[in-house]
Amino acid sequence: MNATILGQAIAFVIFVWFCMKYVWPPLMAAIEKRQKEISDGLASAERAKKDLDLAQANATDQLKKAKAEAQVIIEQANKRRSQILDEAKAEAEQERTKIVAQAQAEIDAERKRAREELRKQVAILAVAGAEKIIERSVDEAANSDIVDKLVAEL
């Protein structure tokens, strides 16, 4: 064998041993460190994605709850509005009934007063008619006619 080839082989073996002993471990450590950083970054991104999904789900739930609460509040407000309107209508109806009753009472009182006034006037007319009958002293048939007319007027 040739001494040059043997020298090259020994130099190559020493070079490989040197690389394996001093160069390869720092390279592997750097590669492993980089792999760990990438792995940690991916895990962190995955956690962030899960957190984002969870936050979105929570936000959606809270939005649904808020909408439901708003709907309940709106329904309660509508019920209260209807109740207030019904109360106002009932109150207005009572007031109308009261006013109508007062007006009817006033009308009845006025009607009664007018009848009393009319009776007084009829009595005055009856007295005046009786005076005329007495003054004229007409026959019995004429007196009957006058009395019948007075009765008809009453």
Curated annotation (Swiss-Prot):
Name listed for the protein in its UniProt record: ATP synthase subunit b
CDD domains found in the cross-reference section: ATP-synt_Fo_b
Entry keyword set: ATP synthesis, Cell inner membrane, Cell membrane, CF(0), Hydrogen ion transport, Ion transport, Membrane, Transmembrane, Transmembrane helix, Transport
Subcellular location: Cell inner membrane
Organism whose genome encodes this protein: Klebsiella pneumoniae subsp. pneumoniae (strain ATCC 700721 / MGH 78578)
PANTHER family in UniProt: ATP SYNTHASE SUBUNIT B, ATP SYNTHASE SUBUNIT B', CHLOROPLASTIC
InterPro entries assigned: ATP_synth_B-like_membr_sf, ATP_synth_b/b'su_bac/chlpt, ATP_synth_F0_bsu_bac, ATP_synthase_B_chain
Homology family: Belongs to the ATPase B chain family.
Gene name of the record: atpF
SUPFAM superfamilies recorded: F1F0 ATP synthase subunit B, membrane domain (SSF81573)
Transmembrane segments: 9-29
HAMAP family linked to this entry: ATP_synth_b_bprime
Subunit note: F-type ATPases have 2 components, F(1) - the catalytic core - and F(0) - the membrane proton channel. F(1) has five subunits: alpha(3), beta(3), gamma(1), delta(1), epsilon(1). F(0) has three main subunits: a(1), b(2) and c(10-14). The alpha and beta chains form an alternating ring which encloses part of the gamma chain. F(1) is attached to F(0) by a central stalk formed by the gamma and epsilon chains, while a peripheral stalk is formed by the delta and b chains.
Topological type in the membrane: Single-pass membrane protein
Record GO cellular component, one term: plasma membrane
